[in-house]
Amino acid sequence: IVSSALIYSAPLIFTGLGGTFSERSGIVNVGLEGTMVMGAFSAIVFNLNYADNLGKMTPWIALLVAGAVGIFFSIIHAVATINLRANHIVSGTVINMLAPALAVFLTKVLYEGKGQTAFIVQNFGKTSFPVLKDIPIIGQIFFTNTSAPAYAAIATALVCYFIIFKTTFGLRLRSVGEHPQA
């Protein structure tokens, strides 16, 4: 159960980390769900189109594509709230409402009127960590039949913690978020 929870929590961890940077900088981003939907949609489309060419690297590159699309939608939210002075909640709600509709529309356009895509060809699959899976009790819970992106998400969370709380950039980010005139 724990390994399945780790697998399914990876997208939420990555999205939560993006939201943490947004909140720490003083931008309330309620559009994270819409950002996640568009990232997932773009990753699936990428995977379906390039799986034959890229092979086993396809899911990892699709993960980067999903992150780039997520950054794009976050930039739209940032421009709307900072430059255009839109309300944070309204802008985020628009992204949350626009993203699923846009994903369904693009699915119908790209896949000839069908409301769904084909199954992805290349996925991350499940892995067991060779040495760590042999640890009594803990090895079976955390390191058997799990997915590598889950551990990449946890490692990214640790890196983000270091960036936010131990670097000059993080100090500036937090100070601007607490007091925008700083």
Language-model segments: residues:
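Hydrophobic core segments of alpha-helical transmembrane domains in multi-pass membrane transport
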Residues: 15, 40-44, 100-104, 150-163
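Alpha-helical transmembrane segments within multi-pass membrane transporters and channels
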Residues: 53-100
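Alpha-helical transmembrane segments of multi-pass integral membrane proteins
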Residues: 133-174
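Pore- or pathway-lining transmembrane helices of multi-pass membrane proteins that form conduits
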Residues: 83-111, 115-122, 153
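Mid-bilayer segments of alpha-helical transmembrane spans in multi-pass integral membrane proteins
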Residues: 75, 97-110, 123-137, 163
